[in-house]
Structures are given as C-alpha cells and as structure tokens.
C-alpha cells in the first residue's frame, strides 16, 4: 500500500480511470506521476492474471531437489589459520564453480561447492558441501574419511595470499565427518508474483545438512521494500555526468525473492510462494513448469468441444 506519506498513491481501479490528463498551466502532482504508473501496472496485472497463476514460472530457469548433497565437517583451523577467512574464496573460485580438492590419504577428489558456519542450520561445526568427482585409490571409498587432510588440486588466492596446487588447505574432524545432506535450488528465471514479472536469480537453500530425508515446504519468500537514495547511490541525480549527492532522486519500489523453507504444518503464505514439498525425503509437489490461469480453462473447454471426454 503506497497511499501513505509521502507518496499518496490513491489509484482506485473501481473508478475506471485509465489516463491522467495533464493540463498546461497546472502543476504536476507527485501522486499523479505515481498514479500514472499504477494505472499501467493494473493493466499488466490484469493481463498477467489471465495467463498465469500467482507464483507461476514464466521463463523457466529450472528447479532441482538434490537428495545427495554431500556434507563434510571440518576443523575451524588449519596450520594455525582460521579457515573461515578463505571459505568464501573456495566456493567462488572458477567463477563460482568451486575448488577441487583431493584427500591426502584416500586420494578421493571432490569439488567444494558450499559451506555453512555454526550456528547456521543448527550445526556446531563448520560444514562444507562437496560434489565428489573421483573415488579413492582403493577403488571403493567414495567419501572423505574422518581426520582426512584436503589438498588443493588447483591454485587459490585469498587477499594477498596465493595457495598453490598440492598445498594442504582443510582438515576433517576426527569423528562422523562425512554425511549426506539435502538441498533445493532454482536457476535464473522469471516468475509472476504480486502482479509483476519478477526476475529470480540462481540460488540454493540447504534443507538438511546431515540428512537426506527432509520434510519441508520450500519456495520463495517475497520481499517488498521502498529504496531511497540513501540505500542506493545510483538514485542520486546524475544529469551532469556525475553523482550529485546533494540531489536525491525519486524512491523506487522493489520486489525481490529468496528461497525459504517452512514446516509442513506452516500455511501462513502471505509472503510465500510454494515451489516444492517433500516429506521424509519423498517429493510430494514440484512446480517446474508454468501454471496457467483463465487461458488454461479456455483451452480445456476447446479440447473438450473438439474431442470430448477422454
């Protein structure tokens, strides 16, 4: 609701106003400029609701449930260095593809893709998530063993320090180091929400760090916010070719989403769009295609008229 100070967007679709007619000699009101956008937005929303249901995928980016999201607990320090200072660089290496490592004893090769720090997700030890690329030298081992030292398979730079291939980088805890977790991810795409077509970035949420039998409702948490020049420097006036910090521009209304998980009993969906439902590791619902609205009813009726009831 933007019919508040200082915007006073009093657009009311019940009045059937479809244009704002500015007149010479009369000042333009801020609420009229905002109302102009609301009139056009209402048209977009009406069309969008005819085609798509709320939360529908418009431009597919892909969704994926990963029940083999392998986790590994590591010690907080290695060679006297706090490993948290370079974990971000480990997962952002190779343009976000992660860093390949090898077990010093086992010979197992894997790529570190993600990590969480205590107390996130209730973990009490630093946990990395690995995609295994190669089994051990014994031809049987497929997960890093307890106490294993991990060696870099490629160079890694953090700050002013560069670690080279074959340098050791992490050490696993002595007991119960490896487990199988679970995660859910979406690829970049567009979804219809709140009457607009929202760009969604590639993202992933860890469902359970040490279990492949999660039970959750997973989807987008929708966030609506007003952004001012104090929040974003790009909103200051740049008419002279540079940012004029003495001249803040208009605020912006922003809609963004992030992946979130909820219990199976939580149906407070005011700001939540469900994409996936899983119970004890078994998929119960997965929205991976567009969900059509009124137009779907039309095509169903036409098919029935042409071909009858199958």
Question: Where is each model-derived feature located?
Answer:
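Subunit-assembly interface segments of extracellular/virion macromolecular structures
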Residues: 1-310
């Amino acid at each position: 609701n933007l019919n508040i100070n200082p915007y006073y967007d009093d657009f009311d679709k019940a009045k059937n106003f479809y244009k704002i007619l500015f007149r010479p000699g009369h000042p333009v009101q801020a609420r009229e400029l905002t109302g102009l956008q609301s009139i056009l937005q209402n048209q977009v929303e009406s069309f969008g609701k005819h085609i798509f249901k709320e939360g529908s995928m418009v431009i597919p980016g892909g969704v994926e449930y990963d029940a083999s999201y392998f986790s590994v607990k590591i010690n907080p320090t290695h060679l006297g260095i706090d490993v948290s200072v370079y974990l971000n660089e480990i997962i952002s290496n190779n343009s976000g593809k992660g860093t390949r490592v090898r077990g010093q004893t086992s010979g197992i090769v894997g790529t570190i893709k993600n990590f969480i720090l205590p107390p996130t997700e209730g973990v009490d030890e630093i946990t990395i998530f690995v995609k295994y690329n190669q089994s051990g030298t014994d031809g049987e081992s497929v997960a890093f063993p307890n106490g294993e030292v991990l060696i870099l398979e490629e160079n890694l730079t953090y700050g002013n320090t560069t670690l080279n291939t074959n340098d050791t980088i992490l050490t696993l805890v002595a007991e119960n180091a490896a487990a199988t977790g679970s995660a859910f991810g979406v690829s970049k795409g567009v979804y219809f929400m709140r009457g607009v077509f929202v760009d969604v970035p590639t993202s992933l949420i860890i469902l359970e760090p040490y279990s492949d039998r999660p039970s959750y409702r997973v989807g987008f948490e929708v966030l609506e916010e007003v952004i001012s020049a104090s929040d974003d420097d790009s909103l200051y006036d740049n008419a002279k070719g540079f940012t004029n910090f003495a001249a803040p521009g208009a605020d912006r209304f922003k809609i963004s989403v992030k992946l979130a998980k909820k219990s199976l009993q939580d149906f407070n969906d005011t700001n939540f769009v469900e994409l996936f439902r899983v119970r004890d590791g078994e998929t119960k619902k997965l929205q991976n295609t567009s969900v059509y609205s009124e137009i779907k009813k039309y095509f169903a009726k036409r098919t029935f008229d042409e071909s009858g009831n199958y």
